[in-house]
């Protein structure tokens, strides 16, 4: 028979650097959702978890609680879905690469269920840029779900689906540090995608995030930490990769030079004061963007095509994505989504 631990006992365990088992992690998250943890304790828990480092067991167990609390208003479409949501937080001020990748991958035949939020930092988040380009983030939940069946892509705005976490936002902002909830964000897509490409801003997050995805029975996934600290695959050098395939984890590296493409500096991806996140995203989707922008989106799209089982060769996936952008197919996909969610 398991022993139910008090909040103080769990906190002490974390302060001593001891990992939580699945049951205790589950209990902790349920107490957060049920308002059974004082605000001062929440600050201590989040700080202690950050200092210790969350494990795959802790992350997957907490994510399960959040997913079970998030009920779909209609049945999940019987489709193989992929998410491109990452942890963010690289501080590089690049354009919205994973958002662009979602539309390019969808134009290449992948059913994309993109989970995302507004930015908590100075950078424009996926929800910010889509909202500014006219995507209706307040469409009915039923319409958001049916969109992936009708259009091949949808966007799930996190606060709409995980209302129970909104109450923690002021404290998280006051703490001023990245917490376990930044890691949980990519793991709690309400549509429970079959596969995912998940970018992390620190190589210390590679193993726990891959372990969490494996424990959550993700069919296929890639966790990537980009060269130079990007939370996307970079064009500049070696990118650290963990392939998750039916529970098996395989460490690898990928570099565009492997298929005879020239390395390009991460600086070419930075949004300057004269640039607009929205204009850059539009130019990428319609194929008129800068070469570095198109190439980095193509590289990351190739990873999505791999997890989706559409293209097992990264170089071929890279070229497939470039071709789709050259035909403005991702922009057409964007317009379809915009019109569908408006109607």
Curated annotation (Swiss-Prot):
Pfam families per UniProt: Glycos_trans_3N (PF02885), Glycos_transf_3 (PF00591)
Residues that coordinate or bind anthranilate 1: 86, 117
Residues involved in 5-phospho-alpha-D-ribose 1-diphosphate binding: 86, 89-90, 94, 96-99, 114-122, 126
Superkingdom in the source lineage: Bacteria
Catalysed conversion reaction: N-(5-phospho-beta-D-ribosyl)anthranilate + diphosphate = 5-phospho-alpha-D-ribose 1-diphosphate + anthranilate
Entry GO MF terms: anthranilate phosphoribosyltransferase activity; magnesium ion binding
GO cellular component, one term: cytosol
Alphabetical keyword list: Amino-acid biosynthesis, Aromatic amino acid biosynthesis, Glycosyltransferase, Magnesium, Metal-binding, Transferase, Tryptophan biosynthesis
GO BP annotations listed: L-tryptophan biosynthetic process
Enzyme class: transferase
UniProt cofactor note: Binds 2 magnesium ions per monomer.
Binding site for anthranilate 2: 172
Residues that bind Mg(2+) 2: 231-232
Protein function: Catalyzes the transfer of the phosphoribosyl group of 5-phosphorylribose-1-pyrophosphate (PRPP) to anthranilate to yield N-(5'-phosphoribosyl)-anthranilate (PRA).
Protein name (Swiss-Prot/TrEMBL): Anthranilate phosphoribosyltransferase
Gene expressing this chain: trpD
């Amino acid at each position: 028979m398991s022993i139910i631990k008090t909040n103080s006992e769990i906190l002490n365990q974390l302060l001593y650097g001891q990992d939580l088992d699945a049951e205790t992690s589950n209990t902790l998250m349920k107490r957060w959702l049920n308002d059974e943890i004082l605000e001062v304790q929440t600050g201590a828990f989040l700080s202690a978890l950050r200092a210790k480092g969350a494990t795959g067991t802790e992350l997957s167990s907490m994510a399960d609680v959040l997913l079970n609390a998030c009920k779909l208003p209609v049945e999940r479409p019987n489709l193989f879905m992929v998410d491109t949501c990452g942890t963010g937080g690289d501080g590089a001020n690049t354009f919205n690469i994973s958002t662009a990748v979602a539309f390019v991958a969808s134009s290449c035949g992948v059913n994309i269920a993109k989970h995302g939020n507004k930015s908590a930092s100075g950078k424009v988040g996926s929800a910010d840029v889509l909202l500014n380009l006219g995507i209706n983030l307040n469409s009915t939940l039923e319409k958001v779900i049916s969109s992936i069946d009708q259009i091949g892509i949808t966007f799930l705005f996190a606060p709409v689906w995980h209302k129970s976490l909104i109450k923690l936002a002021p404290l998280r902002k006051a703490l001023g540090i990245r917490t376990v909830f930044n890691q949980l964000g990519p793991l709690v897509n309400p549509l429970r995608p079959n596969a995912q490409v998940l970018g992390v801003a620190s190589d210390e997050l590679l193993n726990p995030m891959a372990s969490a995805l494996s424990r959550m029975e993700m069919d296929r996934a890639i966790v990537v930490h980009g060269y130079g600290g990007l939370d996307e695959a970079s064009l500049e050098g070696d990118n650290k990769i963990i392939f998750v395939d039916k529970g098996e984890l395989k460490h690898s590296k990928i570099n565009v030079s492997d298929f005879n493409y020239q390395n390009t500096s991460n600086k070419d991806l930075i949004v300057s004061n004269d640039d607009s996140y929205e204009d850059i995203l539009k130019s990428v989707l319609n194929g008129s963007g800068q070469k570095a922008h198109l190439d980095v989106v193509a590289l990351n799209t190739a990873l999505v095509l791999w997890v989706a089982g559409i293209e097992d060769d990264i170089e071929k996936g890279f070229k497939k994505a470039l071709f789709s952008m050259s035909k403005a197919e991702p922009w057409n996909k964007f317009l379809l989504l915009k019109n569908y969610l408006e109607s």
